[in-house]
């Protein structure tokens, strides 16, 4: 099956700023595990010192006053968002299939949606940029399997002002069952049948 790139319509508001999402406090992709810097090393080590997988202890109060103490609430909010439910959602109704994905950290020109072999692939990529801490680049790839029977050429996508990418496609309609038809049976009289057979057996010119 050939690869098809899906164009998406932009629903951005005029005031949208593609660089506003570089500030960690406004992150919406932290819980997706792509598009954000790592947590400080000591936080990663502290989270790993748990009794069993998946256990997370309450955040300790900051031990010192200063920049670190001010930054702690911001990281606490980010961590809380990471542990909450994800923002990638698949919805399917009787006649439509839809995927919603938060791509708030990526500009429209950095996003690509395409279909190939019954799979929708969404990719986003930031080229390497320099900030006050150094160089940073971001990228992600998400793949979703289309329901059976969906026409890849009917897949469409749109980008909302809040940075939510929606990819949807109509589902095939169920096959219409043929209506039952009763065929009437006609009966022929014996006399008609006998006369017809006699006429066929008599050859022309013979007596």
UniProtKB/Swiss-Prot annotation:
Stretches the record annotates as Interaction with TGFB1I1: 72-207
Entry's localization field: Cytoplasm; Nucleus; Cytoplasm, Cytoskeleton, Spindle
Ranges where the record places region Disordered: 151-181
Chief localization: cytoplasm
Modified residues (Phosphoserine): 13, 15, 27, 80, 84-85, 88, 100, 178, 201
Residues with PTM N6-acetyllysine: 125
A GO molecular-function descriptor: unfolded protein binding
Modified residues (Omega-N-methylarginine): 12
Any GO BP: negative regulation of apoptotic process
Keywords: Acetylation, Chaperone, Cytoplasm, Cytoskeleton, Methylation, Nucleus, Phosphoprotein, Stress response
Modified sites of kind Phosphothreonine: 176
This protein's GO CC annotations: axon cytoplasm; cytoplasm; nucleus; spindle
Superkingdom in the source lineage: Eukaryota
Compositionally biased tracts (Polar residues): 153-163
SUPFAM superfamilies xrefs: HSP20-like chaperones
Domain sHSP: 78-186
Post-translational modification comment from the UniProt entry: Phosphorylated upon exposure to protein kinase C activators and heat shock. Phosphorylation by MAPKAPK2 and MAPKAPK3 in response to stress dissociates HSPB1 from large small heat-shock protein (sHsps) oligomers and impairs its chaperone activity and ability to protect against oxidative stress effectively. Phosphorylation by MAPKAPK5 in response to PKA stimulation induces F-actin rearrangement.
Protein's job: Small heat shock protein which functions as a molecular chaperone probably maintaining denatured proteins in a folding-competent state. Plays a role in stress resistance and actin organization. Through its molecular chaperone activity may regulate numerous biological processes including the phosphorylation and the axonal transport of neurofilament proteins.
Family note: Belongs to the small heat shock protein (HSP20) family.
Subunit structure: Homooligomer. Homodimer; becomes monomeric upon activation. Heterooligomer; with HSPB6. Associates with alpha- and beta-tubulin. Interacts with TGFB1I1. Interacts with CRYAB. Interacts with HSPB8. Interacts with HSPBAP1.
Protein name per its UniProtKB record: Heat shock protein beta-1
């Amino acid at each position: 099956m050939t690869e098809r790139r899906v164009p998406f319509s932009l629903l951005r508001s005029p005031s949208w700023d593609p660089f506003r999402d570089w500030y960690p406090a406004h992150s919406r992709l932290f819980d997706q595990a792509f598009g954000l810097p790592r947590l400080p090393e000591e936080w990663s080590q502290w989270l790993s010192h748990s009794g069993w997988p998946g256990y997370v202890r309450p955040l300790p109060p900051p031990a010192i006053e200063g920049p670190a103490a001010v930054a702690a609430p911001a990281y606490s909010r980010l961590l809380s968002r990471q542990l909450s439910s994800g923002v990638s959602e698949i919805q399917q109704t009787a006649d439509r299939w839809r995927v919603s994905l938060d791509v708030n950290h990526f500009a429209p020109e950095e996003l690509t949606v395409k279909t190939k072999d019954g799979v929708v692939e969404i990719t986003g990529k930031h080229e390497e940029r320099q900030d006050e801490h150094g160089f940073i680049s971001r990228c992600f790839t998400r793949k979703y399997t289309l329901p059976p029977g969906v026409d890849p050429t009917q897949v469409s996508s749109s980008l909302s002002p809040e940075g939510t990418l929606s990819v949807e496609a109509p589902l095939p309609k169920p096959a219409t069952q043929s209506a039952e038809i009763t065929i009437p049976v006609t009966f022929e009289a014996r006399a008609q049948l006998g006369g017809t057979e006699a006429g066929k057996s008599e050859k022309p010119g013979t007596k």
